Amino acid sequence: NAISYEIMLKDEGRPAAGRRDGYFSIYRQGGTTTDEGERIDYRVKMYNPETGGQIDVRNNENMVWNSINLKRVRPVVLPGIRYAVMCVPTPLTLAVDKFSVMDKQAGYYMGKLSVIFTPSLPTIN
């Protein structure tokens, strides 16, 4: 079991002038800019296993959780692993603030949200 967990969520990292601090973005396919008219900004909330409440996640910022392996742990079967792995459920909620569709270019919007999870492991002397 890990002593602590470092978690970071980030989007593609493209520049996004006018985007609220901490928000994430998806972009219009075939778009030539990252202007507000060719992207849709969103925010992410995450279940905090330390408190049991929801927290706002900020784009590209590390969060460190300690001793969560002592709370709400349950076995989960993951693809490619023959045995159940002990996990703490941490659902994500993605939310888009209201906007006028007239302010956006027509087309398909897509993006990538990466979740980087780094457990620290105890050392054996």
Predicted regions and their residues:
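Extended, well-structured beta-strand/loop surface patches
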Residues: 36-105, 120-125
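N-terminal small/polar-rich segments of proteins
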Residues: 1-45, 95-96, 100-108, 112, ...
